[in-house]
Swiss-Prot record:
UniProt name for this protein: Ribonuclease P protein component 4
One Gene Ontology cellular component annotation held by this UniProt entry: COPII vesicle coat
EC number(s) from the headed UniProt entry: 3.1.26.5
Cofactor: Zn(2+)
GO biological process entries: endoplasmic reticulum to Golgi vesicle-mediated transport; intracellular protein transport; tRNA 5'-leader removal
Tree of life domain: Archaea
Self-association and partners: Consists of a catalytic RNA component and at least 4-5 protein subunits.
Enzyme class: hydrolase
Positions annotated to bind Zn(2+): 62, 65, 88, 91
Function recorded in the entry: Part of ribonuclease P, a protein complex that generates mature tRNA molecules by cleaving their 5'-ends.
Keyword terms: Cytoplasm, Endonuclease, Hydrolase, Metal-binding, Nuclease, tRNA processing, Zinc
Length: 106
């Protein structure tokens, strides 16, 4: 077996970089291609290092085209039948999130 590395773990570094990339995507709202690229890089890094994305990161981009959501610009939000419905304005993908006491407390 390989020895564990001393110092900061690779997963912790990856999580910090994912957070930074999502911050950059938020700052680059005016440039949709750049913000989508930041989101794609963050997802790739998280998948490669097997780091889970936080729920607020998972819901901040389109799962289909990886566009960073900006409500009113490229995102339509509706509440119907006990679900929050996100509709991407770029690709038209629909994401349904159950609305229950668990999600309200987050």
């Amino acid at each position: 077996m390989a020895k564990a590395e001393k110092g900061v773990s690779a997963k912790k570094i990856a999580q910090e970089r994912v957070d930074i990339l999502f911050e950059r995507a938020k700052e680059a709202r005016d440039e949709p291609e750049l913000s989508a690229r930041y989101v794609s890089l963050a997802r790739e890094m998280a998948m490669k290092q097997r780091v889970r994305l936080a729920h607020y990161h998972r819901r901040s981009f389109c799962p289909s085209c990886h566009a960073y959501f900006i409500p009113g610009t490229n995102l339509r939000v509706r509440i119907q039948h006990g679900k929050i419905i996100y509709t991407c304005g770029i690709c038209g993908a629909v994401t349904r999130i159950p609305l229950n006491k668990k999600t309200e407390s987050r």
